[in-house]
Amino acid sequence: NNSLQDNHLTIKLSGSAGQSLGAFATRGLKLEVSGDANDYVGKGLSGGMIVVRPALASRLVAAQNTIIGNTVLYGATAGYLFAAGRAGERFAVRNSGAHVVIEGCGSNGCEYMTGGVAVILGSIGANFGAGMTGGMGYLYDPDGVATSRLNMETLVSCPVAVPHWQGQLKELIESHAAETDSERASNILQNWDLELSKFIQICPKEMLNKLIHPLGVEATSIPAE
């Protein structure tokens, strides 16, 4: 029911969630998991919010460990996912509207994505963005290696140089930090002016002339090979 207010009902879980956590969750439902989750998290997400963070007793470095499985946000249309850790392969495949922040992903991330926003605060696997025709991606790339893993047949890549897009990115990272207590997100925000320069923005080529707020630096975009 889209008339429900955000966070109308919050369900808190602990341990390891099975497949399809939060599938088709609508606005008003918030799921908080202290632990980890399997494949298909947020499948068909339709306005709800999903938060996955390590258990308080965990000594693992969140950004270096997988916390959600493969094929996350498959076919999602709206809502939010914040996961303090890495996702598996085919992350956000066919996402058409959800906003998500994670801390790394496997191969084929954002495959066939048509809408929404994906922020990845860690390394990506090969063939990122294959068939991506809509939406926006932001990759934290302090080592400067992400562009070699992008599928450049349909994408352009550039610095996050326009205030509108900078604001979108920062707002999502702030929400991620607030929801998950992410150490990586907090460190980035504490040094924002410096860390912003380590992000690259990913956009499908066919979206460039449709953006209300242009990227502003198309001339420096990475061309297709």
Regions found by a protein language model. Name each.
Residues N1-E225:
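Long, distal/terminal scaffolding or interaction modules
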